[in-house]
Amino acid sequence: MNLTHYIASIENYPKEGITFRDISPLMADGKAYSYAIREICQYAADKEIDMIVGPEARGFIIGCPVAVELGIGFAPVRKPGKLPREVVSADYEKEYGLDTLTMHSDAIKPGQRVLIVDDLLATGGTVKATIEMVEKLGGVVAGCAFLIELDGLNGRQALGDIDYKVLMNFPG
């Protein structure tokens, strides 16, 4: 199935010169959404994954159904102040400065094998911060899966040697 037909491209959003890749049409089509989730589950099948980790908000939309399908847990990554218990945090670079992500400090047990799932790999800042937190908690990042990679933004460099799966590529 060619999933690119289910991605809307919005020019000059959220600002001039940016093309936003909207996954809403993919989610609105049960067959396409299901296909995308199954593709990620197949990728994860031989990795002995213990936990799915997904950054807010679209990482939840992709990661939760993957976790349910695999019969494992899901750990959310949130912006500061959104999680009620003790957290670990990691800073990452955005276009105009630093931002921070957090996750519960008991979300990952030492030695757990984690699959990080998100909608988009662009510059790699979000996934790099997520990897840092998982490893800080003693987890092992066994792989990453993304619906979309924006080519030319060097996001894959943030992954280092970590294996990853991308379902679609678009120009960055």
UniProtKB/Swiss-Prot annotation:
Task: State the Gene Ontology BP annotations.
Answer: adenine salvage; AMP salvage; purine ribonucleoside salvage
Which InterPro entries is this protein grouped with?
Ade_phspho_trans (IPR005764), PRibTrfase_dom (IPR000836), PRTase-like (IPR029057), UPRTase/APRTase (IPR050054)
What pathway is this protein a component of? Purine metabolism; AMP biosynthesis via salvage pathway; AMP from adenine: step 1/1
**A single Gene Ontology molecular function, please?**
adenine binding
Specify where it is mainly localized.
cytoplasm
| Superkingdom of the organism of origin | Bacteria
Q: Which GO terms describe its cellular component?
A: cytoplasm
Keywords in alphabetical order, please. Answer: Cytoplasm, Glycosyltransferase, Purine salvage, Transferase
Concerning HAMAP family, the annotation shows:
Aden_phosphoribosyltr (MF_00004)
Q: What does this protein do?
A: Catalyzes a salvage reaction resulting in the formation of AMP, that is energically less costly than de novo synthesis.
Self-association or partners: how does it assemble? Homodimer.
For this chain, the family text in UniProt reads: Belongs to the purine/pyrimidine phosphoribosyltransferase family.
The protein, known as: Adenine phosphoribosyltransferase
Could you tell me which species this protein originates from? Streptococcus uberis (strain ATCC BAA-854 / 0140J)
- Which gene codes for it? apt
